[in-house]
UniProtKB/Swiss-Prot annotation:
<protein>
    <recommendedName>
        <fullName>Cytochrome c biogenesis protein CcsA</fullName>
    </recommendedName>
</protein>
<keyword id="KW-0812">Transmembrane</keyword>
<feature type="transmembrane region" description="Helical">
    <location>
        <begin position="148"/>
        <end position="168"/>
    </location>
</feature>
<feature type="transmembrane region" description="Helical">
    <location>
        <begin position="216"/>
        <end position="236"/>
    </location>
</feature>
<feature type="transmembrane region" description="Helical">
    <location>
        <begin position="67"/>
        <end position="87"/>
    </location>
</feature>
<comment type="subunit">
    <text>May interact with ccs1.</text>
</comment>
<dbReference type="GO" id="GO:0020037">
    <property type="term" value="F:heme binding"/>
</dbReference>
<keyword id="KW-0793">Thylakoid</keyword>
<dbReference type="InterPro" id="IPR017562">
    <property type="entry name" value="Cyt_c_biogenesis_CcsA"/>
</dbReference>
<dbReference type="GO" id="GO:0031676">
    <property type="term" value="C:plasma membrane-derived thylakoid membrane"/>
</dbReference>
<feature type="transmembrane region" description="Helical">
    <location>
        <begin position="250"/>
        <end position="267"/>
    </location>
</feature>
<comment type="function">
    <text>Required during biogenesis of c-type cytochromes (cytochrome c6 and cytochrome f) at the step of heme attachment.</text>
</comment>
<dbReference type="Pfam" id="PF01578">
    <property type="entry name" value="Cytochrom_C_asm"/>
</dbReference>
<keyword id="KW-0201">Cytochrome c-type biogenesis</keyword>
<keyword id="KW-1133">Transmembrane helix</keyword>
<comment type="similarity">
    <text>Belongs to the CcmF/CycK/Ccl1/NrfE/CcsA family.</text>
</comment>
<feature type="transmembrane region" description="Helical">
    <location>
        <begin position="43"/>
        <end position="63"/>
    </location>
</feature>
Length: 309
């Protein structure tokens, strides 16, 4: 019955139908991904389903783009699916570098929650595409919003990877060798390994995850920086001001400062182990408030719509 309705809706409303189909695939993939942590044979199935999810979201966004005539990040519904697309793409990319079932086990639940929020929590009127106001009919829409959303995806993945490091080492001391570059990281590496340069160094599972977390956050920070700069340029063109302290702008700046502090502590101060992992993990809440918190306020130029309105 569900499949029949989905296939019928694919003809009349392909965007919504594909969105719901993505939800059901993620719902199936969730227990498989969690089980793959203990039974690695199912890891391949998890990866195939993630690829399918990413392709279906790509198709959904292309349909919305074709129907609306503008890049599909103009409302909360579209941006949620774009975020899910970014997280799934990041998950697949990281799995190419380091094949671990831990990665999908933390990424897929967030993808599922994101899609479920878009499908079943948002009011129907916020799911509809609408004409853009003149200020948003700009090529900056693609540059600014897409880069910021991808930065959120990278920062979320990095924060969750740090959370996984803390969980794996919850009942034992967390010793992480340096995975950062810079003065502090060099000093730490130099003090511990200068006498062992002739020997190959094998990093533990936690150290690999910590390295992936650091790199993901670094990429997210760079993207967020580009997003803030492009947003300022766009705002100046559209409204004649570079910065207006809009709630979203303010929280984006707070998010930027938060992760700048994290990177400073790792690169310059040589922080390793539990402290940076705790800081990165708490960054997840900062990103969520930045992305969704403004929508609960229902104010500001960046509000996608008050979900209770």
């Amino acid at each position: 019955m569900i499949l029949d309705n989905l296939f019928k809706n694919l003809i009349y409303d392909p965007v919504s139908a594909l969105g719901i189909l993505v939800f059901y695939i993620l719902l199936v993939n969730l227990p498989i991904s969690l089980g793959a942590v203990f039974k690695k044979k199912s890891f391949f199935i998890v990866k195939l389903l993630t690829i399918l999810v990413n392709l279906l979201i790509t198709l959904q966004l292309l349909f919305r783009w074709s129907i609306s005539g503008h890049f599909p990040v103009s409302n909360l519904y579209e941006s949620l699916y774009f975020l899910a697309w970014g997280i799934s793409m990041g998950q697949l990319y990281i799995e190419r570098e380091y094949s671990s079932p831990i990665i999908p086990s933390i990424a897929i639940p967030i993808e599922l929650l994101t899609v479920a929020f878009a499908c079943f929590v948002l009011p129907d009127d916020l799911k509809l595409s609408s004409n853009l106001v003149p200020a948003l009919r700009s090529s900056w829409l693609v540059m600014h919003v897409s880069v910021v959303m991808l930065s959120y995806a990278a920062l979320i993945i990095g924060s969750l990877l740090s959370a996984s490091v803390l969980f794996i080492n919850r009942n034992k001391p967390l010793q992480i060798r340096s995975s950062s570059t810079g003065i502090g990281g060099f000093k730490f590496f130099n003090n511990n390994y200068l006498n062992d340069l002739a020997d190959p160094v094998e990093f533990s599972h936690s150290e690999e995850l910590d390295t992936l977390s650091y790199r993901s956050i670094l990429i997210g920070f760079v993207l967020l920086t580009l997003g803030l700069i492009s947003g300022a340029v766009w705002a100046n063109e559209a409204w004649g001001t570079w910065w207006s302290w809009d709630p979203k702008e303010t929280w984006a700046f707070i998010t930027w400062l938060f992760y700048a502090a994290y990177l400073h502590m790792r690169i310059s101060k040589g922080w390793q182990g539990r402290r940076p992992a705790l800081l990165a993990t708490s960054g997840f809440l900062v990103v969520i408030v930045c992305y969704l918190g403004v929508n609960f306020l229902g104010i500001g130029l960046h509000s996608y719509g008050w979900i209770f309105g």
